[in-house]
Each structure stands twice: as C-alpha cells, then as structure tokens.
C-alpha cells in the first residue's frame, strides 16, 4: 500500500452541497457525543476526506479506531443514501489513520519474524477488513512467509505461515 496523499482541504466556497451536508451531519453527531469539533473537507469526484480537529479527539478515535470507523460508516451511509454513484467517505483526526497503519506494518513484520523464528504459524487477533488488508500488504513481498484470513466477521483474523520451501 502506498502512503496516503497529504490532505488538502477544499475551500468552503468550492464545496458541493453533498460535502456540506456530510460535514453538517458529522458535526451533529460529534455535538451529540459532547465532543465539539472543527471539520475540514477535502473533496474529489470519488471521495470526501474529512479531518476532525479539536479537544478530546481521542474520544472520537475510540479503542483501536472503532469509534472513528463507526462515525465514518454512518457518514458514508448518510452521504450515499439515494445516490447512484458511490462516494467514498474517509474520516481522520490527529493523523490517526497513518499512525495506525505504521503500527500495523511494524506488528506484521514482528509477527512474521516470530513465525520464522519458531517455525509455527502466527494467528493474529480479529481485525476489520481495512486493517487485515494492511497486514497482507505489509508482508506481500516477504520471501519467508505468506498470509491469509480465516474466520467469520467480526472475528476474522490474519494467519501468518511459513512459505513452503
């Protein structure tokens, strides 16, 4: 996976009605949660990227990003309701997504080393599809191990095994 492109906010007067409605919807959610936030929106034809800032952003991130993922899901449902073409919605705050991706890549490499050292498969904890994809991608070029996912949602997890020599 390539590193994410730097965020560039779209000026307010250039935002589409869809982007403004998405921002207002998300502002309503954060206010109801008691976490006031400012939201910058970067808009392309395929995606709305929304970056939240303010105090107490850790509340919006939640445990392993679960709250942020839930807010992203709800905002995406709201944005895409009644639309013919799907518009991808991504949320971030305090550069959480990039930090989490880097932490997952380091974890993948540590667990691959463990598999090589012990000669046994390593079963990772359950993760969402996005995080599993990061692990698979991180180890794709590794000559010693291979990865696959097992289980059913929400308990689907990555398994790291030695490549057959």
Locate predicted features.
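RNA-contacting regions in translation and RNA-metabolism proteins
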Residues: 1-165
